[in-house]
């Protein structure tokens, strides 16, 4: 891991900040008047109790596609709340995801991120399913996420539910090692004007404008626009990497409470951006989406929901010769879901879905997707029954997802989960799950160069990667301390490989399923209220990935493309409420080295200082990567980028 002395020093700094702020004579206990002292004490106590309760009793929906208490979930789930995001100083969704200790998050350059759960990390990671309000943000090119265009306004996020481990039984293929579900606020919670903006050394300039209003007594809406400019990162030699970029996005949401039992929501976004690259024209990215959701409570024991969305993405990527790789993706998705309680012991959720993706690529001589245009369909159905063997004590969930895709046909992904409430403060859970990662276009239809003879070609017989996962977890609350432990072991079959066609000749290579593997480890998190004003949260992850070739495989990659993950990581977050409406937050992380990329381990510290002169105005200063002038987080030399220390200021006004 990062140098032990650096870790110890930074950890001591975070703790010392809290001790000084809370224990200095008169600092935390001397409000301006007796009235202020009484109001502040009550407010802090309420906040403390709510936070501890929320950790165990917060309602989540990502584990079983229905509302349930966090303490009752048989899954390794962490929740990033709106307050966590606000106090973190994060300026983008990937930065906010660093708050989840069960994720591996690495910044690659000014706009690219490598994000995964339980290993297999890369900028094209393909074993993590990401949703925004139920809309899958997914590219058929590599079964992953273009993180740089997932620019959800952070002030509009209600919470982010992060599951590490399989979620395929309910969410389908590619929810192999985790699910990230971003849930935004109802329009009724974003009424009035909000203006936010600022700038600094790396995040050069940014701004958000939002307005929420009402149409009658039952319809609420909001509209927003935002944009930013980011500075370039450094190359390993210290020179500018020419990867600065500019981005804007606008959108809306309408929530209509049709009656006490029926609700309808309509929302959408449009975006456009330009990304610099050395020795070539800028990369252009654009897209948009629109989504309709409807829900109806049929009775106290029956609830129906449906959604329909359309999503378009476009990327124009020039190369140094002036050729353009032009990519258009159009996604149409519809899903119907029904939840019903059957008798006193069964809570059943079932659903049907359909997805159509039209993908068109304008190829170049350097690389091509053949055929250039494809239309792929997915048909899905799922069912899960939660059985109360002993009410309020012992619950078992059994379910499966059945999915048909145009590449591999029918895929079945079952799971079984057990949740045992040992006492009101202690829970044990266990799970066994099967998940698959279905082929993407890069697995079957990618060719480099674009014309024969090819050095690298997609495998026409590439089949789904398979996982069988075993999990065991523990949760406990004692007073002001909450603990969570999740352990896991997974076996993988048919992992992606690069097969030599004519060994020992290094080329050509064909993408195949020539590798198997395993991963195992543990994820630990803790939250502790030291005082009414000072909260600490900490986490530690131990992870091992082992990958090996199958008998007869001529794989040339040796698993290197599947294992860019540190063995261990540690984080410590401190949040302190000071007098005079001042808040101080410090977030420390220590990340182990990535051996096969020669990325050294590192320790870093982010901090945010906020003053609220009035209830409607926030003034903040944020420091990022404060321990080093620059450092690397991901990538191989000599093309690796280094992330620089940054400072920026923020003004937020609500009226």
Annotated model-derived regions:
Residues 388-390, 394-395, 488-491, 512-593:
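Gram-negative outer-membrane beta-barrel transporters
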Residues 168-169, 181, 189-190, 196-198, ...:
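Periplasmic-side early beta-strands and strand-to-turn transitions of outer-membrane beta-barrels
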Residues 280-289, 293-297, 327, 427, ...:
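Outer-membrane beta-barrel signature, preferentially recognizing the C-terminal barrel domain
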Residues 257-271, 284-410, 419-423, 476, ...:
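Face-selective signature of the C-terminal outer-membrane beta-barrel domain
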Residues 212-214, 257, 430, 468, ...:
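Conserved C-terminal beta-signal and adjacent last beta-strands/turns
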Residues 30-86, 297:
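Short, acidic, small-residue-rich periplasmic hinge/interaction motif at the N-terminus
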Residues 61-78, 94-136:
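Extracytoplasmic beta-strand/coil segments of soluble accessory domains associated
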Residues 136-164:
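Short acidic/polar hinge/loop motifs at secondary-structure boundaries
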């Amino acid at each position: 891991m990062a140098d032990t002395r650096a870790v110890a020093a930074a950890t001591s700094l975070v703790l010392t900040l809290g001790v000084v702020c809370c224990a200095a004579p008169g600092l935390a206990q001397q409000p301006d008047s007796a009235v202020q002292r009484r109001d502040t004490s009550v407010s802090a106590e309420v906040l403390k109790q709510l936070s501890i309760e929320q950790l165990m009793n917060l309602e989540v929906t990502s584990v079983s596609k229905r509302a349930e208490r966090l303490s009752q979930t048989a899954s390794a789930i962490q929740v990033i709340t709106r307050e966590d995001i606000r106090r973190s100083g994060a300026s983008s969704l990937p930065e906010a995801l660093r708050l989840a200790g069960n994720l591996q998050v690495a910044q690659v350059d000014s706009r690219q991120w490598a994000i995964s759960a339980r290993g297999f990390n890369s900028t094209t990671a393909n074993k993590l399913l990401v949703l925004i309000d139920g809309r899958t943000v997914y590219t058929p090119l590599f079964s992953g996420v273009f993180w740089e265009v997932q620019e959800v306004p952070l002030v509009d996020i209600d919470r982010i539910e992060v599951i590490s481990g399989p979620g395929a039984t309910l969410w389908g293929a590619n929810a192999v090692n985790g699910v990230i579900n971003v849930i935004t606020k109802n329009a009724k919670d974003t009424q009035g004007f909000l203006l936010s903006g600022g700038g600094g050394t790396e995040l050069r300039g940014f701004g958000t404008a939002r307005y929420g209003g009402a149409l009658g007594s039952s319809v609420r809406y909001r509209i927003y626009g935002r944009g930013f400019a980011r500075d370039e990162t450094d190359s390993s030699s210290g020179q500018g990497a020419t990867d600065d970029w500019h981005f804007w996005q606008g959108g809306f949401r309408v929530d209509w409470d049709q009656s006490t039992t029926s609700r309808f929501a309509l929302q959408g976004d449009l975006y456009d951006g330009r990304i610099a690259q050395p020795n070539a024209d800028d990369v252009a990215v654009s897209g948009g989406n629109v989504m309709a959701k409807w829900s109806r409570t049929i009775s106290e024991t029956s609830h129906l929901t449906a959604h329909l969305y359309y999503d378009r993405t476009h990327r124009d990527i020039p190369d140094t010769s002036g050729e353009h790789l032009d990519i258009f993706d159009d996604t149409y998705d519809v899903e119907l879901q029904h939840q019903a309680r059957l008798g006193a012991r069964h809570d059943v959720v079932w659903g049907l879905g359909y997805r159509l993706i039209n993908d068109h690529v304008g190829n170049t001589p350097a690389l091509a997707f053949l055929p250039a245009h494809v239309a792929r369909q997915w048909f899905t159905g799922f069912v899960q029954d939660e059985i109360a063997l002993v009410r309020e004590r012992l619950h078992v969930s059994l379910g499966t997802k059945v999915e048909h895709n145009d590449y591999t046909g029918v895929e079945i992904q079952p799971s079984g989960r057990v949740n045992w409430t040992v006492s009101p403060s202690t829970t044990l859970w266990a799970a066994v799950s099967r998940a698959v990662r279905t082929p993407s276009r890069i697995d079957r239809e990618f060719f480099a160069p674009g014309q024969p003879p090819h050095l690298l070609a997609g495998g026409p017989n590439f089949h789904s990667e398979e996982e069988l996962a075993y999990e065991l977890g523990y949760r406990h609350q004692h007073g002001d301390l909450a603990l969570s432990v999740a352990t896991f072991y997974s076996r993988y079959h048919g992992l992606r490989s690069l097969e030599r066609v004519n060994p020992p000749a290094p080329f050509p290579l064909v993408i195949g399923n020539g590798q198997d593997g395993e991963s195992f480890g543990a994820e630990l998190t803790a939250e502790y209220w030291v005082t009414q004003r000072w909260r600490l949260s900490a986490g530690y992850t131990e992870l091992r990935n082992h990958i090996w070739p199958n008998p007869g495989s001529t794989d040339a990659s040796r698993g290197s493309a599947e294992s860019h993950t540190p063995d261990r990581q540690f984080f410590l977050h401190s949040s302190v409420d000071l007098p005079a409406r001042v808040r101080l937050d410090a977030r420390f992380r220590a990340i182990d080295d990535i051996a096969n990329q020669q990325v050294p381990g590192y320790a870093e510290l982010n901090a945010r200082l906020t003053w609220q002169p009035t209830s409607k105005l926030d003034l903040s200063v944020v420091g990022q990567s404060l321990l080093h002038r620059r450092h690397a987080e991901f990538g191989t030399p000599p093309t690796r980028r280094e992330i620089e220390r940054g400072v920026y200021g923020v003004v937020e006004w609500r009226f």
